[in-house]
Structure formats: C-alpha cells, structure tokens
C-alpha cells in the first residue's frame, strides 16, 4: 500500500467577492472562500495547522499561518468531509491564494494536504 493511498486529503475551494463588505475607493476588497476538505485516504487524520500565501495584483505577498481552521482542529475519518468558510481582505481587485494544511494521521504520521492556487477576483460585468 502506497502512502499516497493511505494519506490522501483533497481540498476544493469556492471563492466569492463580498461587495457589501468592500470599499474599493479605500482599496479594500473583501473575499470569502468556502473550503471542502475530504479524506480520501485509508486512515483518519486531524488538521492541526494552516499555511496560506496570499498575493495581490501588485505582487505583494502575505503569509498567514495558524493552528487549525476557524478555531477547530477537525478529525476526518476516511470518506469524511469538513466544510468551512473564511475570508480575506485584499488591497487590489484581484489576487491569488494557495497553501497547505498540516495533518496528523491517527497512526502518528505527519503529512501536508496541499491547497492549489485559486483566484480571488471581482466578477466583471459586460456592457
């Protein structure tokens, strides 16, 4: 059995612009993102930390690290999902986020669950 089969976490992200919480004239653009974390592996694992790299349209990079997500360190059994929504404020109308979660399996193995880059952007209207 390969480690990839034993320790497999998938992450899906759905970002959205929060117009009512943004103030473009002040350089504040609010975005929410809903995350689905799915344990595709064969052993339960706990999400213990998060690591984000946030880049705005000017190339300014911010690193955000912390314990768990939204105040929790969820344990996912094989086949289980965990969903949460959080947010970020950018100084530009678009940017990207990417990162990973630190996971600890029930057998003590530590591994990373990558979060592929995703785009934060204001929806454009066509005229």
Swiss-Prot record:
It comes from the Bacteria. This is Protein ApaG. GO terms for biological process: error-free translesion synthesis. InterPro entries: ApaG_domain, ApaG_sf, Uncharacterised_ApaG. PANTHER family: F-BOX ONLY PROTEIN 3, POLYMERASE DELTA-INTERACTING PROTEIN 2. Gene3D superfamilies: ApaG domain. Residues 3-127 form the ApaG domain.
């Amino acid at each position: 059995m390969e480690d990839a089969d034993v320790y497999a976490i998938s992450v899906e992200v759905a970002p959205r612009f929060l117009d009512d919480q943004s103030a473009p004239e002040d350089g504040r653009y609010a975005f929410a993102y809903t995350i689905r974390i799915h344990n595709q592996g064969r052993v339960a694992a706990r999400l213990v930390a998060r690591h984000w790299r946030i880049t705005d349209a000017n190339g300014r990079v911010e690193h955000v690290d912390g314990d768990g997500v939204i105040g929790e360190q969820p344990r996912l059994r094989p086949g289980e999902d965990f969903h949460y929504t959080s947010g970020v404020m950018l100084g530009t109308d678009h940017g990207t986020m990417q990162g990973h979660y630190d996971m600890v399996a029930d057998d003590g193995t530590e591994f990373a669950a990558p979060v592929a880059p995703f785009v934060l952007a204001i929806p454009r209207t066509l005229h």
